Amino acid sequence: MQRDIIITADGSLTIHLPEWNEQYHSKHGAIQEAYHVFIKQGLHHLCHPELVSGSYPVSQNEQSNNISILEIGFGTGLNAFITLLEAEKLNISIDYYGVEAYPVLMNEINQLNYPQELNAQNEASTFTKLHEVFWEAPHKITPHFSITKQNRFFSEIKEKESYNIIYFDAFGARVQPELWTELIFKNMYNALKQNGILVTYSAKGSVRRAMENVGFKVERLPGPPGKREMLRATKS
């Protein structure tokens, strides 16, 4: 399948699949989407709600300086890299698990400009390291951030109450509807700890209903640039 590197509206690059007319990140801004969906409405909401405008206070047992995150669709590593930067900034420890069935090749990774666009040029080698470390083993990347990359299908996730946050960043339901089913979301529900959250860029009604049908409490939230809404699901 043909794969092109394209520039998005905020200046950051992503990978475009012409055959599917699908991108790894939003064409309206790869970095803006990642920050809004996964950091602001995910990590900040759970750990530092005061950073989220209009956020309600959370009880003490919902706050933690030791967070376990599962990413569904490790892809370019953008979400992992931004989360690493936030872990250092907020002084929180994160164990990050990135699941990817079809890893992106290093020749594509080397073309991406995320460290530059994030004003994190000094961490460019860290971004590369996220991709160079071996799969299926934990790696301490910084004092606050460890990563385990897992080369497997999303349907193979069978962990129980293991994660505080799930970044659900699979390709869209238009091109891969099998990734947005009740079966998948039941696995996600089981994998989350109590009061854990799942955040995703999608706001499709069928996705929201699939989440609700397996037990999630689902919120519609304002979306990133180019999207009216997104979803956050809580295991309560």
Annotated model-derived regions:
Residues M1-L46, N66-I67, L85-Y97, A101-L118:
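Rossmann-like AdoMet
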Residues Q194-S202:
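Conserved beta-strand signature within the Rossmann-like core of class I S-adenosyl-L-methionine
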Residues N65-G75, T83:
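Conserved class I S-adenosyl-L-methionine
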Residues S53-S64:
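A cross-taxon signal for low-complexity, glycine/charged-rich
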Residues V214-S236:
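Core SAM-dependent methyltransferase catalytic element
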Residues L179-Q194:
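A short glycine-rich, Lys/Arg-flanked "PGG" loop and its adjoining helix->strand segment in the class I
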Residues N110-E159:
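S-adenosyl-L-methionine
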